[in-house]
Each structure stands twice: as structure tokens, then as C-alpha cells.
A protein has these predicted regions:
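Glycine- and small/polar-enriched repetitive beta-structure motifs of secreted/surface proteins
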Residues: 1-117
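Extracellular "spike/adhesin" assembly and maturation modules
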Residues: 115-144
Length: 144
């Protein structure tokens, strides 16, 4: 918060966390240089070394992003001025506005634990479906 000129509700823990913040509001940065390039972005949360600092190219500053979460060393936004991205994992990069990304390109599997657990997806008409797998390995989509 060393360059803060305005803004409110910001929390920074770690050397250079929110270091360029000038007028942004309601950001939380934990870790060395996390969200350090944010100048006008708002309502972002970043945890980890350099989390939320850059965009996916690794050099362009994430300075105006908003409503996003970055967890992991060098977790990055897809682009500057992005919105509503959830990015989890070391070196993971977002995949666009209103998206969630878990892991970088080296992650080869995503496991959902628990008996009966599933993934809920929404169709274009708004109907929600729970996707599960039965004991024979068949994929089942159930409207919920």
C-alpha cells in the first residue's frame, strides 16, 4: 500500500503487496508482491507470491482487474481489465472473464471426492444438471 493515494477497504500483507495501489478499493493481497500492479482494480483477492500480479503472458501488469481471486505462486489473470476470474494453482492462468481455472497445463486430472459427488452445470435455458458417474462408469446427467 506504499503508493496509495485514495481507496478504501484494502488489506495487504507481505512486501510490495498492493504496492502500486492508487485508487482501488476492497482488495486483499497476502504474499510477496501479490496484486502489486493493481492501480484501479477492485474487489480482488490474491494469496501467494506474485499472485494476481501479471496477466497470462507473465509480463503485462494486471492493473485494472476486478472481482477476481488468485490463489498460488504466480497465479495470473487472462488479461488486464478482466473480471470475475477464479485462478487456483502455481503458475495457473485465467481463461477469460467469468471463468474458473484450476491448475496450469501440467495438471492432468481433477478429482471430485465424496460418494455421490458430482459437478453441477447449467444449460443455456437455465436448467441445472448434476453430472455424476455410476459404478459401471456411465455418465449420468440429472436435472436438479
Amino acid at each position: 500500500l506504499s503508493k496509495a493515494t485514495a481507496g478504501k477497504g484494502n488489506t495487504a500483507i507481505g512486501f510490495s503487496a498492493l504496492g502500486e495501489k492508487t485508487t482501488s478499493n476492497f482488495n486483499t493481497a497476502v504474499g510477496y508482491s501479490s496484486l502489486s500492479n493493481i492501480t484501479t482494480g477492485f474487489r480482488n483477492t490474491a494469496v501467494g507470491n506474485d499472485a494476481g500480479k501479471f496477466t497470462s503472458d507473465g509480463t503485462t501488469a494486471n492493473s485494472t482487474g476486478r472481482n477476481s481471486i488468485f490463489i498460488g505462486d504466480s497465479a495470473k489473470a487472462s488479461a488486464d481489465n478482466q473480471t470475475n476470474q477464479i485462478v487456483i494453482g502455481v503458475g495457473a492462468a485465467g481463461n477469460g472473464d467469468n471463468s474458473a481455472t484450476i491448475g496450469d497445463s501440467s495438471v492432468t486430472a481433477l478429482h471430485v471426492g465424496g460418494n455421490g459427488a458430482g459437478i453441477v452445470l447449467k444449460s443455456p435455458n437455465g436448467t441445472a444438471y448434476k453430472i455424476t458417474v455410476d459404478n459401471a462408469g456411465a455418465i449420468i446427467a440429472t436435472a436438479i
